[in-house]
């Protein structure tokens, strides 16, 4: 009969310690990697979401009949005229009804998009400046004119700069007098 040596629990402790240390280091590495990649991944995801909103907007606007298209712009012109008649539009805009219906062809709040070629920015513009929306897109500042042109109108568009999760207007400081942008 042969006797095989048995391992004592004290012999296994260094192996267990090594595994625990390895798991802790792996966890720290994964947390660090996640923190490092978050801005890039989040910006990429927001870019996809923004592009999808713009494509959906374009598709719906192109499918509008000329009559519906005219009606949407006439309502925005009417809103702008009513806004111009107010003494303090930025504080009295609530007196005008139908803000959320203006230029809202898809019913999702997108009223257009801004394209700034010089800094490679193309962002959807939504009604209002709700903080959760401004984390991934531009907002039309309520109380300013809708961006449809016209004498005496002044549209104000807002977006964040310097968010780690989305580029948005981060590079706006690279624009110079004379640079152009398009609102569609």
Where are these regions (language model features)?
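Solvent-exposed, non-transmembrane regions of membrane-associated and secreted proteins
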Residues: 17-184
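Surface-exposed, charge/polar-rich loops and edge strands
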Residues: 12
């Amino acid at each position: 009969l042969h006797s095989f040596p048995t391992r004592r629990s004290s012999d296994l402790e260094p192996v267990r310690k090594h595994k625990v240390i390895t798991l802790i280091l792996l966890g720290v590495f994964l947390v660090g990697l996640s923190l490092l990649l978050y801005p890039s991944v989040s910006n990429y995801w927001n870019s996809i979401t923004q592009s999808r909103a713009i494509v959906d907007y374009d598709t719906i606007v192109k499918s509008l009949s000329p009559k519906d298209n005219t009606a949407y712009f006439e309502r925005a012109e009417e809103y702008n005229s009513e806004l111009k008649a107010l003494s303090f539009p930025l504080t009295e805009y609530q007196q005008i009804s139908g803000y959320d219906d203006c230029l809202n062809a898809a019913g999702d709040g997108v009223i257009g998009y801004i394209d700034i070629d010089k800094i490679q920015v193309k962002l959807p513009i939504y009604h209002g400046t709700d903080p959760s929306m401004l984390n991934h897109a531009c907002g039309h500042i309520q109380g300013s004119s809708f961006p449809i042109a016209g004498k005496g109108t002044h549209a104000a568009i807002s977006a964040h700069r310097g968010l780690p999760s989305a580029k948005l207007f981060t590079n706006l400081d690279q624009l110079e007098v004379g640079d152009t942008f398009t609102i569609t």
